């Protein structure tokens, strides 16, 4: 049996439902010798801001039980250098390219997106309003409902390409934020970004990260992420991209069963950059074994 692996995120058709998450795969060219990039459902780029950012001082990555803490601070090359140095390669790889945008003001989000709109080869945008690692951005946007509305509304007016709002789990009711994004024209939400976490070195009695707290990712957060996807799926009609601790095809299928149309592999890329391809292959195998002719039929198919 031939399994149809295509899924839709707004008007964007993905080859398969497995993308690589922002910040875990660079801009694609870093992994070209290790991964057959055309087999990915898509690449979500490292976050881009208007100007280059050096990020937070080290240490900014710490391994934890079942996961990883990071406090990178949105270090990136800036949008103009991305257009000049990275976008030409991304245009050539034969899979969808989604650019992740981060900013410290609503106007900056709009300016970055406007610059990207002038370029060919970009299939959609993921808007990072939820990064907990930067003191002057991220968290304040992602936990404020009215600002979420404003960002989505203004960016929607600037593009007809798929607009994906990446939500933080560090709020009381995440479905309110998903509904706000949906009401203002977002095509999808990406759920979840990292949880806030902290680790301490008991020998020095100092925090293990220079910024004290950071973003927790990896298998430890998967049950939380699944619950958030499930909550949102019961509240909105737009697509959901599930993120959080996906290491295997089984993990990805869980996200789809509770309502995700697609998934992103993140932390696992640091262990094995080809994880996303293996996850996509595993989803096809599961569908074949269960006589399911389209991966789209997995979305929301959890039995009660």
Predicted regions and their residues:
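N-terminal capping/small domains of soluble enzymes
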Residues: 1-97, 102-103
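Active-site metal-binding loops of divalent metal-dependent hydrolases
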Residues: 23-24, 244-246
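Alpha/beta enzyme core
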Residues: 33, 37, 104-241, 247-254, ...
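Short gly/pro/ser/thr-enriched loop/turn and capping motifs at secondary-structure boundaries
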Residues: 49-54, 132-134, 196-199, 270-272
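C-terminal helical cap(s) of enzyme catalytic domains, especially alpha/beta-barrels
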Residues: 55-65, 200-214, 256, 268-293
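Small/polar glycine-rich anion-binding or flexible loop at a beta-alpha turn
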Residues: 246-250, 272, 304
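A short, charged, Gly/Pro-tolerant segment at domain boundaries
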Residues: 296-304
């Amino acid at each position: 049996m031939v399994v149809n692996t295509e899924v839709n995120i707004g008007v964007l058709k993905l080859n398969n439902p497995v993308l690589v998450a922002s910040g875990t795969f660079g801009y694609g060219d870093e992994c070209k010798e290790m991964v057959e990039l055309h087999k990915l459902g898509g690449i979500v780029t490292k976050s881009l801001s208007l100007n280059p950012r050096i990020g937070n001082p080290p240490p900014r990555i710490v391994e934890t039980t079942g996961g990883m803490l990071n406090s990178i601070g949105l270090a990136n090359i800036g949008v103009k250098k991305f257009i000049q140095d990275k976008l030409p390669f991304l245009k050539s790889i034969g899979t969808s390219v989604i650019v992740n945008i981060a900013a410290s003001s609503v106007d900056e989000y709009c300016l970055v997106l406007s610059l990207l709109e002038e370029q060919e080869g970009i299939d959609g945008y993921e808007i990072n309003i939820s990064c907990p690692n930067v003191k002057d951005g991220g968290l304040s946007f992602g936990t404020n409902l009215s600002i979420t509305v404003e960002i989505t509304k203004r960016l929607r007016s600037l593009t007809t390409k798929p607009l994906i709002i990446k939500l933080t789990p560090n709020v009381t009711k995440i479905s309110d934020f998903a509904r706000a994004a949906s009401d203002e024209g977002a095509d999808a939400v990406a759920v979840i970004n990292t949880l806030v976490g902290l680790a301490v070195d008991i020998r020095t009695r100092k925090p293990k990260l220079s910024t004290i707290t950071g973003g927790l990712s990896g298998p430890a957060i998967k049950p939380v992420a699944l619950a958030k996807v499930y909550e949102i799926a019961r509240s909105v009609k737009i697509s959901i991209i599930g993120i959080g601790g996906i290491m295997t095809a089984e993990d990805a299928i869980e996200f789809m069963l509770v309502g995700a149309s697609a998934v992103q592999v993140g932390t696992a890329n640091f262990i094995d950059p080809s994880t996303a391809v293996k996850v996509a292959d595993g989803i096809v195998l599961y569908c074949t074994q269960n006589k399911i002719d389209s991966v789209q039929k997995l979305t929301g198919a959890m039995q009660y």
